Amino acid sequence: MRILIDTDVLLDVALAREPHLTASAGVLEWAESGGEAAVAWHSLTNCAYLLKGGRSFLSNLLQLVEVPETGTRDALLALDSPLGDLEDAFQVAAALAWKADLIVTRNLSDYRKSPVVAISPADFLAKAAGG
């Protein structure tokens, strides 16, 4: 199972945001234990900005995940997306480029029209555990 991890899940961990920390950290632990995970390129820049640098967090993160190769075609796909939020459309474009099975996010409602199924961190962990 290949997953793309949305920025909100990363920020839950980096900022220790309760009550989301446990499930979101579990997603990164799944990746650390060998699960196939990726983050969109722009998630890195969003985290760097919001974490006032966050080099250590990002360096550790990049030991666990891939960053899908995306380009102009993917950006145009995102711009033409039916999703209301453009940042989410860029997440979907990255997920499609990487052939992700799921997008792990807390913002499920933003991904209703996504061609890649969105799942919450808690539900993903249950699915990954076989439940």
Model-based region annotation:
Residues 49-69:
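Helix-adjacent hinge/juxtasegments
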